[in-house]
Amino acid sequence: VNEIVPELLKQKEKGKIRFLGITEQFIADPSHEMLKLALPDDYFDVVMVGFNMINPSARDVVFPLTIENNVATQIMFAVRRALSKPDALAEVIDQLIESGDIEASLVEPGAALWFVEDHEEIASIVQAAYRFCSHEPGATITLTGTGNEDHLKQNVDSILAGPLPVEISTRLSE
């Protein structure tokens, strides 16, 4: 920070850099420790942050700082493997219950997100995941990636579908 950031700021003043950004390593830092340290210094114009229905912790520890400092966010990991593959989701939920991050009484064994899947206003878990991220206060852009044109259209349609129903958002927050 003491060496690189001052030089980046000089280059920004010269017009050679338009925006300064920083990306967390969400897999290695799921509690956003680096961003909690970096954002209060107010050097960055944009951050790339992991945020999804399985780990929405950025809502409490990152977004308040980005909103306060007018920092844009690029949401990554909106749809993780676990949200697109039922077996992977069951495995992750079991791990979260075992670690104490999720209360076992709040989930159905083998069907943790049944209330999302069964809701008439939600086409799929993947759609719900994109809607969850895209309409979060503090989320600027939700990244999506695919090599399949049909999937890309579905992802864009999901992002544009509007926020999740209140009862779904409330239940996911539990």
Label the predicted regions.
Residues V1-M48, N52-V61, I67-Q74, H135:
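Glycine/proline-rich, positively charged
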Residues D41-Y43, V61-E174:
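Structured C-terminal cap/extension of enzyme domains
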